[in-house]
Amino acid sequence: MKNYRIESDSFGEIQIEEKFYWGAQTQRSLNNFKISKQKMPKILIRALAILKKCAAQVNYEFGDLEYKIATSIDKAIDRILAGEFEDNFPLVVWQTGSGTQTNMNMNEVIASIANEELTGKKGGKFPVHPNDHVNKGQSSNDSFPTAMHIATVLATKQQLIPALNNLLTYLQDKSKDWDKIIKIGRTHLQDATPLTLKQEFSGYITQIEYALERIEDALKKVYLLAQGGTAVGTGINSKIGFDIKFAQKVAEFTQQPFKTAPNKFESLAAHDALVEFSGTLNTIAVSLMKIANDIRLLGSGPRCGLGELHLPENEPGSSIMPGKVNPTQVEALTMVCTQVMGNHVTVTIAGSNGHLELNVFKPVIIYNILQSIELLSDSVNSFVTHCVKGLEPNIARINTLRDKSLMLVTVLNPHIGYDNAAKIAKEAHKYGITLKEAAKKLNFLSEEEFDKIVVPEKMIS
């Protein structure tokens, strides 16, 4: 049989299962928002705990919290950060648009843990009060966006940047010995002039290098924290200097260059910094979609496609066609890219709907951004491990397709003119003969002249 205790808020008393540490406002949220199962991301909960830890330290240093209260709050948060109370943060994303219930969830759990340590009994509001002590000098309106920024930075630095650097390393490693592999280029999915396989992959490498640069540029505004703006940006009930000292504490704890936002009205009412960052994630998804699709095309076959790359064979690909193997890692990555693009649409709409002094789409903004970061990170790591590491060029196929290409005729333009070169290409295509045979047949060049000019190795620089 379940045991319950009674907690209360301004709406009155409410029953809470005894084993949990949350209070009345968390329980009301559980009762009122039974909408799907997407919970607040763990890294956001961690960011909120870091926020409360730093706020309590500043409040103590400012003389606004007694030592006993501040210490008990700090110890409680350390236990949360150690993962001891993960099941005490059950709220879904689909709640109030300011994230108030999740902010109170954190306040209540911290106070409850602290009270248990001090009195032997969890819950309640004495001696540690969730609002008066844990939430002191704060509002959900500045705390939740601050946690959004902290979580975004931590997830990016811990997950996404390492994943992209890993992809960059393996693309560079794979292609470094491919400078002698001359293949036919393709534009409009039609044959074009030659290039090396290394040159082709250098485009992908640069896309990832630019992605990493874009992340660093977009993070500059995400480092700015709303804390200290309190309810509407004026800083009511927050001491002068709290915002600066708080940001310094967060920067010290996370080892990231957080600063207080210069204008708190903007940081509460708008989330342009996160919309911009989501745009960067969207651009990364665009880059990865292009890279993955190219590898998919170059690996098509095995006998009737381009077949210029051998992709690793990881699992059977068909329930009806024996022996079929598909580019499954490419398919997983490209599906992730479409999800990230869709997430950016959601973030864009949510970001554009900040009304007057507060944007109230905060949970859906951070949920989609953190999902995009996680999906990109995980899918890129999987793509590297199960695809990129095992890529190998099919030299024989590359040479065959290159030597058959009509577009090698381009190099003849300076010697016999565009129109005559076009006649050679059309003649070769019409009669199924080589360019050399067509050039000789049309009396434009001898075989010796043709061989001297049409040298793929001289067409790649």
Curated annotation (Swiss-Prot):
EC id: 4.2.1.2
One annotated GO molecular function: fumarate hydratase activity
Biochemical pathway: Carbohydrate metabolism; tricarboxylic acid cycle; (S)-malate from fumarate: step 1/1
Keywords for the protein's UniProt record, in alphabetical order: Cytoplasm, Lyase, Tricarboxylic acid cycle
Positions annotated to bind substrate: 98-100, 129-132, 139-141, 187, 319, 324-326
GO CC terms, sorted: cytoplasm
Recorded catalytic activity of this chain's protein: (S)-malate = fumarate + H2O
A family per Pfam: FumaraseC_C
Enzyme type, top EC level: lyase
Positions annotated as active site in the UniProt record: H188, S318
Localization (cell): Cytoplasm
GO biological process, one term: malate metabolic process
Domain of life of the organism encoding this protein: Bacteria
Site (Important for catalytic activity): E331
Family per similarity comment: Belongs to the class-II fumarase/aspartase family. Fumarase subfamily.
Subunit: Homotetramer.
PANTHER family: ASPARTATEAMMONIA/ARGININOSUCCINATE/ADENYLOSUCCINATE LYASE (PTHR11444), FUMARATE HYDRATASE, MITOCHONDRIAL (PTHR11444:SF1)
Further details from the record: There are 2 substrate-binding sites: the catalytic A site, and the non-catalytic B site that may play a role in the transfer of substrate or product between the active site and the solvent. Alternatively, the B site may bind allosteric effectors.
Function of the molecule: Involved in the TCA cycle. Catalyzes the stereospecific interconversion of fumarate to L-malate.
Name of protein: Fumarate hydratase class II
Organism: Rickettsia prowazekii (strain Madrid E)
Species lineage: Bacteria, Pseudomonadati, Pseudomonadota, Alphaproteobacteria, Rickettsiales
